[in-house]
């Protein structure tokens, strides 16, 4: 596994564990020589992860639409910055470059990227592993909702395996590498 796309919040959230564990994930990326592919911002958990990887001599590729350069405050210190025209192009490029996906805590944008990636896996557009970094049980309510959707007959039980989950950065990467 060479590259992992990470979806993450453009804010750091209100619990110190979000940033602390994101930094630890960055160290694990660098230690395992896995390149980060992400949205290209220097703010929030996106920036925390990129900075951690760069501080440990890892590689980071940011992908951002031109019109978001000011709003998301583009990270100009990344190894490679790819400028695209639209959010659709950003997501397509991130997916094209990635061998796997991780979702860190985040808001609507993170949820949208996560669910689009899961939907693509469900219909066979890709077979790349996907995992949630469940810091402070951030994603536990979402996992419960997914289980509820399975019980209600809206998601096939076999598709539950499309989303892995871990609370430890090394275990998270180990699971993805094993699946990839």
Language model features: what each stretch is:
Residues 123-141:
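Short, positively charged, low-complexity/disordered linker segments
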Residues 54, 121-128, 154-155:
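Arginine/glycine-rich "motif VI" loop of SF2 helicases in the C-terminal RecA-like domain
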Residues 1-97, 135-180:
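A cross-family phosphate/adenosyl-ligand binding-site feature
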Residues 91-123, 131:
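Active-site/ligand-binding-proximal alpha/beta "capping" segment
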